[in-house]
From Swiss-Prot:
InterPro entries: KOW, Rib_uL2_dom2, Ribosomal_uL24, Ribosomal_uL24_CS, Ribosomal_uL24_KOW, Translation_prot_SH3-like_sf. It comes from the Bacteria. This is Large ribosomal subunit protein uL24. One of its GO terms (cellular component) is ribonucleoprotein complex. It holds the Pfam family KOW. One of its GO terms (molecular function) is rRNA binding. Part of the 50S ribosomal subunit. The keyword Iron does not apply. Belongs to the universal ribosomal protein uL24 family. The gene is rplX. Keywords: Ribonucleoprotein, Ribosomal protein, RNA-binding, rRNA-binding. GO terms for biological process: translation.
Length: 118
């Protein structure tokens, strides 16, 4: 799928404000209301994988004789527009904005409260 995306004429890599390790809350879809940590971001598809959210079961056949098959449960990706950054301290969701501090370092903060993220 990534190859087909790269071959499109107007293909653009989407810049994501959500990073790996951020705590997010699902705001849309069947998993709405759940919170979790971002395990992986996929910028080419504008998707994120969140720990404990959007679980899928995968049936794995035995690869060798004598080995039994398994049923694995793993997280599937969500579209990045369906999640928002979640502040555990204030217990609210907010958009993220970038700014440059006095030392000239680019940082992230919450738009609603101004709380620094990193």
């Amino acid at each position: 799928m990534l190859d087909s995306l790269k071959q499109k004429k107007n293909f653009k890599r989407i810049k994501m404000r959500i990073k790996t390790g951020d705590l997010v809350k699902v705001i849309n879809g069947k998993e709405k209301g759940k919170t979790g940590e971002v395990l992986k971001t996929i910028p080419l598809e504008n998707r994120v994988v969140v720990k404990g959210v959007n679980l899928r079961t995968k049936h794995v056949k035995p690869s060798q004789e004598g080995e039994s098959g398994r049923i694995l449960t793993e997280e599937a990706s969500l579209h990045a527009s369906n999640v928002m950054f979640f502040s555990k301290d204030k217990n609210l969701i907010s958009k993220i904005e970038y700014f440059i501090d006095k030392e000239g370092v680019k940082k992230r903060r919450l738009k609603k409260t101004g709380e620094l993220i990193d």
